[in-house]
Regions:
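Alpha-helical transmembrane bundles and membrane-interface segments of multipass inner-membrane proteins
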Residues: 2-183
Length: 183
């Protein structure tokens, strides 16, 4: 008599779902993974284009007085914090992935929250790829109109994804979570 093979354990969130709900959850995950992949590819493409077409340190105006593309290499984080400390970025990126994975498990039926986590993940992957390949991140977007307030930040598409993702998560925490608690 043949022994029945034990079934492969499913992630905690999927164990309590019915088969149709599990299929819907798997499809939902696929959509978010595809969105993240498109964002990572877009980030990769923009950075590659800038490295090829704009010499290091040079700028090209996109909208005069508003935004330009300035090719720089950033070995730090936002505002050049932790400059040159690559080990710090490797560790924090891996920790960020672990935290996002834990938060994802508890985010069933929270699409706004999940989109925030997806954006954060895509941005983290985009910058992580640069750090692994070059030991720096290619930044390019310079908001000229902020220079008058001595805010001379230059950032990349991955940074935009991370920032928008954090905004999505904060909006969920401040507004949507309260609605769910009342219901």
């Amino acid at each position: 008599m043949a022994k029945a093979r034990p079934s492969r354990p499913r992630p905690l969130i999927l164990r309590s779902l019915t088969a149709p709900a599990r299929a819907q959850e798997d499809f939902s995950l696929l959509i978010y993974v595809m969105v993240a992949a498109v964002l990572v590819l877009l980030d990769f493409g923009i950075k590659t284009w800038v490295r090829i077409h704009i010499p290091l340190g040079d700028s090209q105006s996109l909208i005069p007085g508003v935004i330009d593309l300035t090719h720089i290499r950033n070995t730090g984080a936002a505002f050049s914090m932790f400059e040159g400390k690559q080990w710090f970025f490797y560790v924090t990126t891996i920790l960020a992935f672990a935290v996002v994975a834990m938060l994802w498990r508890d985010s069933l039926h929270k699409p706004f929250y999940r989109m925030g986590l997806t954006l954060i993940t895509a941005g983290a992957i985009g910058n992580f790829i640069d750090r692994l390949r070059f030991r720096y991140v290619t930044d390019m977007f310079h908001l000229e109109f902020l220079d008058q307030w001595r805010f001379n930040a230059i950032f990349n598409f991955a940074d935009v994804c991370i920032t928008l993702g954090v905004v999505f998560v904060l909006i969920y925490i401040l507004f949507d979570r309260d609605k769910a608690a009342v219901a």
